[in-house]
């Protein structure tokens, strides 16, 4: 039997997932139960779009709860104190020079479960994140991305 996938996460990422799980189990489940009760009061279920919608939402929420529980059960939390501060790892804030666009960009390296590219939180499994892991200030990396190859120079490494 294969081993369950480990989800590399920071303490902050685990906390956010725990909060989402708690919200879904306590607040969202109750809301959906109420929606189902109201929809059932309309009678005939064969053409009851409110009931169908509530049941679909319930299925989605229950699926997300299972997903979150699995991620938390298989979380591998990175202790940022165990990694040298000058080496890029999960939990690092990295300022790089992007040679393609001739600009400085700051990324926060996180586990895949925490990735949020719109807020510059990139996964350690993404091409750029993977390329930065283990590197230090002054290192230049080339990363294959969908548009070709991007070149970055590491300018700063800090901890979140």
Curated annotation (Swiss-Prot):
Entry function: Necessary for efficient RNA polymerase transcription elongation past template-encoded arresting sites. The arresting sites in DNA have the property of trapping a certain fraction of elongating RNA polymerases that pass through, resulting in locked ternary complexes. Cleavage of the nascent transcript by cleavage factors such as GreA or GreB allows the resumption of elongation from the new 3'terminus. GreA releases sequences of 2 to 3 nucleotides.
Record family assignment: Belongs to the GreA/GreB family.
Coiled-coil positions: 14-76
GO biological process, one term: regulation of DNA-templated transcription elongation
Superkingdom assignment: Bacteria
Family annotation (SUPFAM superfamilies): FKBP-like, GreA transcript cleavage protein, N-terminal domain
Name of the protein described by the UniProt record: Transcription elongation factor GreA
GO molecular function: DNA binding; RNA polymerase binding
PANTHER family: TRANSCRIPTION ELONGATION FACTOR GREA
InterPro entries for the chain: GreA/GreB_C_sf, TF_GreA/GreB_CS, Tscrpt_elong_fac_GreA, Tscrpt_elong_fac_GreA/B, Tscrpt_elong_fac_GreA/B_C, Tscrpt_elong_fac_GreA/B_fam, Tscrpt_elong_fac_GreA/B_N, Tscrpt_elong_fac_GreA/B_N_sf
Record keywords, A-Z: Coiled coil, DNA-binding, Transcription, Transcription regulation
HAMAP family assigned: GreA_GreB
